[in-house]
Amino acid sequence: MTQANLSETLFKPRFKHTETSTLVRRFNRGSQPPMQSALDGKNVPHWYRMINRLMWIWRGVDPREILDVQARIVMSDAERTDDDLYDTVIGYRGGNWIYEWAKQAMDWQQKACQEQDAMRSGRYWLHASTLYNIAAYPHLKGDELAEQAQALANRAYEEAAQRLPGSLREMEFAVPGGSPVTAFLHMPKGDGPFPTVLMCGGLDAMQTDYYTLYERYFAPRGIAMLTLDMPSVGFSSKWKLTQDSSLLHQHVLKALPNVPWVDHTRVAAFGFRFGANVAVRLAYLEAPRLKAVACLGPVVHALLSDPQRQSTVPEMYLDVLASRLGMHDASDEALRVELNRYSLKVQGLLGRRCPTPMLSGFWKNDPFSPEEESRLITTSSSDGKLIEIPFNPVYRNFDRALQEITDWINHRLC
């Protein structure tokens, strides 16, 4: 089936799809205090979703493109679930978040199909994949339209990979007790086996969101990147997130000696946000298999155990947490009790001495991840490194931090 036909098949105009903001029915929603963070964007008044400009621009989206799509959503007079929230238009039609971002992605997909130059075509496919992922954001379980956008994002990503430098392999890993999981191994030019970073992404992102990380930071240093969707989303959607948050990544890590392109004696893990929960667990449970673990804005204890901090987090992020935990109609109290069990300190891991070198980067006044969180990680390691990342200028400092983290990982893998 051609890309165009697939798009038409998946996105038939219908108006009965459940609107994203209604998928999680928590009982006592509160008011949203203003909040901004480098990794998550900010909760802009009159938007259900957090507007994550830094990460979208970092992934290659032009700021003007973001504003154009937002403008189309704002200007729509179609029926909304909540008249006060622009991005709650009901049904797949003009003004609906998924519709507008997918429409933008389809324009780039069409350009990719028409482009004769393979490299340029690959760039267009990659851009289409990024936009489809934004369409599906924040990837709540049961969001049919978002799942269709994710399918298109993955297809576009595969098309891009065939045309861009290096090589990409789609790999399937068996996991006892359930469905196998699909991972993407990104390999730089040259002969393997390669030192490899196992990417542990955030709960509101897909594994295909990290190509920029590979291309700009790992590939130039000859490092491969292996990505895997977090439990309950994407290719790992049949797995529920549990307190054993590292289960899927752990099975993949154990299988690496059987992957000929990976030097399984030189593997590190890198965790963004809740992905750090996975990475730090691996540092304790699989120390002999890991040379290093790096974290950025980690969510390993404070947000999971502190009701006060949870009350400052935007509704969308709490919905993401509830969705991943399979608690679609839970009260905030029930959600808090469950989240506490995911704290690595409560689990008895963090605070104990860990032989794996661990680095953690943080931003001052980060509502999701205070400085103490990163300090707890680095002081638990026998070889810890703490990095404070200045907020402004946000893009330049983010790039500088990633360069420093990659150099640290590279040094540990050598």
Swiss-Prot record:
GO molecular function, one term: carboxylesterase activity
Keyword presence, Hydrolase: yes
Enzyme class: hydrolase
Reaction it catalyzes: a carboxylic ester + H2O = an alcohol + a carboxylate + H(+)
Keyword Hydrolase: yes
Enzyme Commission designation: 3.1.1.1
Alphabetic keyword roster: Hydrolase, Serine esterase
Coiled coil (residue ranges): none
InterPro entries: AB_hydrolase_fold, FrsA, FrsA-like, FrsA_esterase
Pfam families: FrsA-like
Family classification: Belongs to the FrsA family.
NCBIfam families found in the cross-reference section: PRK05077.1
Function: Catalyzes the hydrolysis of esters.
The protein's name: Esterase FrsA
Gene name in the database record: frsA
